[in-house]
Design a protein with these regions (language model features):
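Short alpha-helical segment of the dimerization/phosphotransfer core of two-component systems
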Residues: 6-11
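Conserved catalytic submotifs in the C-terminal HATPase_c
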Residues: 32-37, 54, 59-69
């Protein structure tokens, strides 16, 4: 029963990823951007993956930021990306290995980051530029661990790009891999032509970038952004 539930969950996840990827390709992906605590999200993943770490006999270390990191982003979509990256680290790290998750804010306070490092086999340098492409597979000694559609990393890159952020991988071959997710702080980077501002259950048009910046002082209020597209695809 557990195996059946696991396979069903994986299949559903794959279907959802394919649908999301198609929405992005067609320019129909909606972002529901709200202000949330990135520390709390990352901390929830520590609890979620702790059991897996024990089952796989992998050392799992989390280092949260010293202060709360409040970020304007699509919470659900960002969670998908972070979960994908941590899941990959477990997938490619053998028993006795190590996985480190760290986060923080850049020195210039312009963006925040979540970094996932593993001690697995790593990724060939020739493949680093390809792993974020759809259906890409890394070809190395543990190639069996890289089988699959490859859509997870491709979807992750597209989601982060919609947020005007970056995601990239580094890997000294044979020494594991490091994936870094960067999100800009604030909300001025969201284009007014692409964003609607939700406040108090009402939709307010944001025609100018200054309007977005001016509302930054209200970040403590419950607010949302959404791209100005419908959900159809």
């Amino acid at each position: 029963v557990d195996l059946m539930e696991k396979n069903t969950k994986q299949m559903l996840q794959l279907v959802n990823q394919i649908l999301d990827f198609r929405k992005i390709q067609n320019g129909k992906m909606r972002l529901h951007v709200s202000l949330f605590n990135l520390n709390e999200m990352v901390d929830s993943f520590e609890k979620e993956f702790r059991v897996m770490a024990e089952e796989n006999e992998v050392s799992f270390t989390f280092q949260l930021a010293g202060e709360d990191i409040m970020v304007w982003a699509d919470k659900e979509k960002v969670a998908i990306v972070i979960r994908n990256i941590i899941s990959n680290a477990f997938k490619f790290t053998p028993a006795g290995g190590n996985i480190y998750v760290t986060m923080g804010v850049s020195d210039d306070d312009r963006h925040c980051y979540v970094r996932v490092e593993d001690s697995g086999v790593g990724i060939p340098q020739s493949k680093l530029s390809e792993i974020f492409e759809r259906f890409s597979q890394a070809d190395n000694a543990r190639g069996a661990y890289y089988q699959g559609t490859g859509i997870g990393l491709a979807l992750s890159k597209e989601i982060i790009s919609l947020h005007h952020g970056e995601i990239y991988a580094e890997s000294p071959e044979g020494k594991g891999a490091v994936f870094t997710i960067e999100l800009q702080l604030g909300k001025e980077h969201y284009k007014p032509s692409e964003v609607d501002f939700y406040m108090g259950g009402e939709t307010v048009s944001v025609p100018e970038a200054e309007s977005v910046s001016a509302s930054a002082g209200k970040e403590s209020e419950e607010s949302d952004f959404a791209t100005d597209d419908d959900d159809d695809f």
